[in-house]
């Protein structure tokens, strides 16, 4: 990573954003010499890899087991009890401004990102009645931290004085991969205890950061928590500002991107399950699907945790024993629930589009969809109602699902009392357990983009890359990195990638951060 090269287009407002240049090479394949590449998985990572490979002239086939693109951000049609149709999905996702590479992918079909709409705040409400807001907090560190302390009702100057400053100093200079070497053996909870982070403000760390991994913070690696603080708060000048799609995911994002890929010549094979892959004697790779065997010169596996484990386990010719053990050790986070309710009356006009919650017995956030999504707004306008979405993360494996679903509705009525008299026109409850878990001590075992085979790369939010990225941005970044690695081997230049700064933002902050290691 180097400073921004002269004349390049910076993707955000942060002048200290890092840039990763691709290996030098020719601009694209010449007609007739383009290799064939398989991309297995049609989520963000696979879409990024397929996009870049196709843009450089590779002959790409994209395999996706579901009937639509988008992976964990896919959507599907459902008919409601009132006879209308709606698009259901896995629900609210925040497209933060520092998601440079994901936003770059979306710019392929929406150069001005007009299909994303900003939400003005990221409020967090505690059951004790206090609400934290980031709307008025300065965006550039260290003023963001100072401004938050000055404005927060749950974290004040007095709390700052009780913290173990030396234990907190590593937050000021997070570096990848060094942060994992220092903190991967510690849990997120244990780190906050060491810092003496105020108990009343624990929800700030857990709801904003660690719960975003769908994980119990007692299991989550502290290195991931520090990385999240760096990406969203202490390392980036983009701030905790984000956008959301103004229509459901298929209409706003994946439909246009799928059309773009097909115009580039990509063969998109949805509804196609890849059972196994194996090296070909003459070079390249063969994939076995329900319809037969397909041959390619290279492949990107851009699968979720369970899919990656299954394909590798069924493909004995892949990798080394140590590499296969690393894949087998990839863990899945606990199950979570997304409940969407169509109600016959509106919530109060001042209710935000998104509200993080803490202390409400399992309810992690509430979204009011008509505040930002056109389809929900049209339903609400026709029916005089509202569309709300409730999330519960890290639900116990033995929990009774119907009780959890009822509990979320009860919590909604507690947080937004005006919903107590509302009739539920219809509801959908999505239970999933397919997100990666990053437990204490796991970083060194995680699979990387490069594999023992030069013709095979991995991508996805479970895949390790030594860059300060997480969640959807890790998926997009590893997708581009996977394509870059294959292109470099073929002598073709890949794509420039952007990240938040890879160290503390200033010499003073880096010097303070270094004190903790002495």
Where are the regions a protein language model picked out?
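Extreme N-terminal leader/targeting segments of oxidoreductases
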Residues: 1-37, 55-56, 78, 508-518
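C-terminal lid/capping helical subdomain adjacent to the catalytic/cofactor pocket in oxidative enzymes
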Residues: 3-7, 27, 441-518
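Mobile amphipathic helical/loop "lid" adjacent to a hydrophobic cofactor/ligand pocket
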Residues: 10, 102-103, 107-108, 113-226
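N-terminal Rossmann-like FAD-binding beta1-loop-alpha1 element of flavoenzymes
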Residues: 32-62
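Glycine-rich FAD pyrophosphate-binding loop
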Residues: 54-81
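Conserved FAD-binding subdomain of flavin-dependent enzymes
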Residues: 81-117
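Helical element adjacent to the flavin cofactor pocket in flavoenzyme catalytic cores
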Residues: 228-290, 294-298
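C-terminal segments that line or cap access tunnels to active or ligand-binding sites in enzymes
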Residues: 296-298, 303, 307-446, 452-457, ...
